[in-house]
Amino acid sequence: MAYFLISVSNRKNLELCENYALAGFTNSINGLWTFSEIQEGDFISFLYGAKAHNLYRVEEKEAIKDAQDLPPWDSITFKMSGITYYFPFRLHLSQIRKYSESLVRAEFAYVAENLLLRGGYRKTHFQADQTTLQSASQLGELYTETIAKLNVKKYETFVPRFTKSKDTVSPPEIFRFFEIILQAAIRQHLSEQENLSAFLHQIGVETLDTGKLEALGEKALAEGHIDILIKEATPMGLARKIVIEVKTGLARLQDISQLSMYLNELGNECMAAVLIAKDFSRKVLQEAKGRGISTFEYKLGEIESGVPVTFNELKEDLQLIKVT
C-alpha cells in the first residue's frame, strides 16, 4: 500500500472533499495520471495551504461518463483556451484520522522537501514514503463524524485507456500515452515483490530484502527529479537506495550524465542506478557501462500497434529486458 498527498486548488474544494469523503481529478492527462497512480487500498491525505488534511483509505475508484455537471465540484472553463475542466476521475474514501497539520512538521519532511525543491504545487499529487504514513497514522484523532450523502443522478462509468495513435485520442476516455504513465506502470510493477526480486537480481543487488523495500514515484533532488526511487521502507543504520530514470524514447548521453549526478549526490548509500528506455545506441550503452549504470529496454505489447489499452493491461504487458 502506498501513501499520497493530493493537491487541492481552493478551500471550497477541500471542504467538499472532506464532507463527502471523495477525491476528484480533472479530465486532463495529469488528472488521469493521478487516478492511475493511486490504487484501491492506498492511503491519501489532502494537501492545501501548506498543510496535510486528514488520513483516508481508498475504497473504490471510478471514472464517470459525461461528468461535466456532476456534483460536488464546479467545472472550470479557461477563457484563453476555451477548455473546460471537470472531475470524471474519482476516489471514494473511508475516513481514518482527522487532522490539519503543517508540512513543516518533521513527520512530513519527505513531502516538504519535494515541494521545496520543485518550487511549489506544480503537481497534482505527491507520493510519501512509509515512514511518513506511519507518522501520519499517529496524528490527530480517529474520525468519528458521519459523511454527507452526495445526491447524484444515475450515471455510467468507463475504464480510461491510453494510446500511441493520435487518431484514436478522445479525452477523457482515451488519452495519449505519456512518459508519466510509463513511470507509474513501472513503479507499480516493481512494487510487486516477485518482480522487484527479479529486477534486483539482474542489476546485481541481491543483499537487500525485497520485503523491506518500497518503490516511490518522483523524488526531487538538488540536481533534478528521480523518476523512481527504490529504498528501504524503515532504514536501520543504513538508508540504501536505487535510482531509476525512465524514458519513453531513445536513451541519450544526457540521461547517463543525469543519473551520474544523482549517484554523486546520494553518495555511497546509493547502491545502483538504472536507465529504462525504448532503445539504446551502442554509444549510450558503452557510456552507461563505463559509469556502472544498468540499462533496460521496456516492452509494452498491444499499445505499440496503436490499440488503446487500460492501465492494468499496460502493466500486464510490461516487460523489462536488460541490455548490455
Describe the residue ranges of each PLM region.
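Charged, terminal alpha-helix-loop-beta segments
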Residues: 2-20, 39, 94-99, 112-324
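Short, charged beta-turn/beta-strand-edge "cap" motif at the junction between a beta-strand
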Residues: 47-53
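Aromatic- and Lys/Arg-enriched surface recognition patch
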Residues: 57-131
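Core residues of folded domains in eukaryotic genome-function proteins
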Residues: 54, 89, 240-242
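GIY-YIG nuclease signature motif recognition
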Residues: 6, 55-57
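Short coil-to-beta transition motif at edge beta-strands of beta-rich domains
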Residues: 34-47
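Short catalytic/ligand-binding loop motif for oxyanion handling, primarily in non-cytosolic enzymes
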Residues: 53-55, 65, 283-284
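Short alpha-helix capping/helix-loop boundary micro-motifs
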Residues: 24-34
